[in-house]
Amino acid sequence: MLQKREKVLLLRTFQGRTLRIVREHYLRPCVPCHSPLCPQPAACSHDGKLLSSDVTHYVIPDWKVVQDYLEILEFPELKGIIFMQTACQAVQHQRGRRQYNKLRNLLKDARHDCILFANEFQQCCYLPRERGESMEKWQTRSIYNAAVWYYHHCQDRMPIVMVTEDEEAIQQYGSETEGVFVITFKNYLDNFWPDLKAAHELCDSILQSRRERENESQESHGKEYPEHLPLEVLEAGIKSGRYIQGILNVNKHRAQIEAFVRLQGASSKDSDLVSDILIHGMKARNRSIHGDVVVVELLPKNEWKGRTVALCENDCDDKASGESPSEPMPTGRVVGILQKNWRDYVVTFPSKEEVQSQGKNAQKILVTPWDYRIPKIRISTQQAETLQDFRVVVRIDSWESTSVYPNGHFVRVLGRIGDLEGEIATILVENSISVIPFSEAQMCEMPVNTPESPWKVSPEEEQKRKDLRKSHLVFSIDPKGCEDVDDTLSVRTLNNGNLELGVHIADVTHFVAPNSYIDIEARTRATTYYLADRRYDMLPSVLSADLCSLLGGVDRYAVSIMWELDKASYEIKKVWYGRTIIRSAYKLFYEAAQELLDGNLSVVDDIPEFKDLDEKSRQAKLEELVWAIGKLTDIARHVRAKRDGCGALELEGVEVCVQLDDKKNIHDLIPKQPLEVHETVAECMILANHWVAKKIWESFPHQALLRQHPPPHQEFFSELRECAKAKGFFIDTRSNKTLADSLDNANDPHDPIVNRLLRSMATQAMSNALYFSTGSCAEEEFHHYGLALDKYTHFTSPIRRYSDIVVHRLLMAAISKDKKMEIKGNLFSNKDLEELCRHINNRNQAAQHSQKQSTELFQCMYFKDKDPATEERCISDGVIYSIRTNGVLLFIPRFGIKGAAYLKNKDGLVISCGPDSCSEWKPGSLQRFQNKITSTTTDGESVTFHLFDHVTVRISIQASRCHSDTIRLEIISNKPYKIPNTELIHQSSPLLKSELVKEVTKSVEEAQLAQEVKVNIIQEEYQEYRQTKGRSLYTLLEEIRDLALLDVSNNYGI
């Protein structure tokens, strides 16, 4: 029977008055205890995971331990952890949403043996707060009382260890109840986990950091920063329009002086604001860190500043270069932080000389984050000299107003600076990507497909699904080396003469049940992470590379969408959605499909499915396949033309392939060439995504997952318009239709690079496409600007995107006859779906950043050991696409590289090009105009660089110890580069990234075998992309310095 209590809350209003609120609080005789020792499992009604039965004790951390040591409690070795509701609420109220979400995710994670016990709703555990009792004492008393109840509830069969930092609680409760022990967290680790070295090191680091914070708070220091305003003042200011709320974005090229606050989160009533708000200098930033949700006060207009437009290297001192900034823009200062965005940071210790300069016995060390946007962090350690050659992870603990730098603590070592695995681990940590293997519980949910026990289509599914194995020619077209084939196509002529177009997608949701362990894991990962040399799958390989991969010649479950098209106009007559069984006839690569489309039938010898056929069968099947590819392409052209008529954009992106020579060395970087068959497949997928979006929105208008692409801000197109104007083109950006038409017309017949650069600028001006719940915004906001579609979603890649799994479940619920049953297990509420969309958007952004950074690793690897003074491949043609006050921005078409080239060096000398067009540095000055920049020396020589000029560029590497190495560009001639005979571009097809990794690893293995080093054999499924469970063969690359990879990022103020 429920018992009713009253909880009294005292809140302070904006006017400073105290408001007394009384709320009803109901207590239950039974709440889920999640213990396998529960004597009344039916009454406790356990939902979700249970604590492991293979433990010697349960551990219950009090509120302070949860707040300070959560990162240790995350260790998978620590098992049997019971988080009390009281402790969780304390984290939520005192540490903010980020820490609370971290705790929630830990509780949801099936790989961690921990549960939540709702002690404040259990009749015997709930304790009212006594008069005069502090909140901290009440929380500790409540947790201890719940621990005692839990021990007796399990019939005294499992000892309970309560860990606390409250010495009074240890003395009071330590020997009060037999079987319930109360000790400090440090003693707990010493006694129960003496061999868990990483936990002990982290605990010592946290303790030392905490002691120093306490000591600093007792000392008297001058204020380095103003105090943040109280929360109630900030909220009142936002509501009244005096303050503006937004996310702080630090300019990584001028991290000490420039940051910006985006306006979309603002509530300001100031209608004059049409741009971001500039936060100039560290004082105005007031201890906020990149990504924090901040509250900003605008400065008077006479104090507004402009952003700097000069190029600037990241490792410069951020001092003003003397160049005039842009026009003044809204400028403000941070007055408070609503939500901190602190995360794990990869840092580098100072060099030996720098450490010695701080004093021989110095324990407080300033470490430099790998991310330029993060300030130096002060940590306490006696290992500074030991760790100075390593990349390490630290976490920020606090940033007091009396300290110039934030305080943090050491977490763990990643690897040596410059080593491949250390650099890859850096990219993963910086993007908050976790790559731990799938757990045993998750793998137990997976189907079995082995030679001894092969997977087969079940008779039940055969009855429920439409069988397309004999009636349809189904085939896939994918990149070389692709193993996770999640989409196939079909096209055929119907009896009435019309055509039937089919898109068939792997039925992942058949194998991944809602809220199962593997579903929760896939939701957490949200996407498959593709790096240049490896991938980290969202789903186990038994699904992603086998049973959910629509490989040729095997039966597979699919979710299909099939349209009946008019035979002449290709207009859609009807559409069918449903679950099917398919058997793909061909697994084609893009290149082979394009050759067949172009009529080059000799490529048939490279298609495995044709090898064992007799000539007659071979000819018949070839004609059938060629007709299907041709018809698909014709349909795709029609579909694309319709979208083009509505304003669909064709934008520019550069993807680079890596070529190897005969000796397995990286020989060349070649931008991939687009093929028409790429567009054919893409149009079919876009069509399927569009129709599924319409279907799920019609059925679930308030809780469907769609993808929106908002129109870009017009001011973002200013550079595009000015550059086009320099070539005599006019770019109309009023709508996607006018923009698309303008870009199509902006073609220079003498230089096709111009149109590519203009499209690239248009891409940079675009907003990001985002997932959203249809219940969270108005229908007119559903539009996808880039694709020119009113509704769009992602349905076609459920192997590698969790959003597609959600959409598959929505579609199945929409077409299900028994909707009530489907809806119950498959659909999120609008609120939960919107939260999930935010998470997926965040993970997608992390995936994009990590892929870009790892690709830049290979670009840097290519140039790392080449002598730029003598190596012809370090010389290339470059095209100027932007003018700055002290240099230009260049695009290198051959390698797909963008970067900056200075026209004035650090010594104040300017570039000069003599009669032979070769450059040298001389005293002089620069004069910047709208579309050109002129360098004039003191002896009267001058050279002018215009937008879209072709120049000769030298490419080299700029090394950095604390950050990633970067590519550096230098103009050596104001004339285009003429490729010599010895430098002709090879005509052979570029190798894919996966093939590159195989070749590089092979050469490493051979070198190691020559040294008689034993190498453990890695399972075949991990060879493709080097996704390994333990130590990888990549650790062996340390022995071959010429293959060491270093991250490349654009290191200039662009």
From Swiss-Prot:
- Any matching Pfam family: OB_Dis3
**Keyword Magnesium recorded:** yes
Give residue ranges for domain CSD2.
365-431
Q: Name one GO biological process term.
A: RNA processing
Q: Which UniProt keywords apply?
A: Cytoplasm, Exonuclease, Exosome, Hydrolase, Magnesium, Nuclease, Phosphoprotein, RNA-binding
**Listed name of the protein:** DIS3-like exonuclease 1
What InterPro entries does the record tag this protein with? Dis3_CSD2 (IPR041505), NA-bd_OB-fold (IPR012340), RNase_II/R (IPR001900), RNase_II/R_CS (IPR022966), RNR_Ribonuclease (IPR050180), Rrp44_CSD1 (IPR033771), RRP44_S1 (IPR033770)
> Manganese: is it a keyword of this entry?
no
Top EC group:
hydrolase
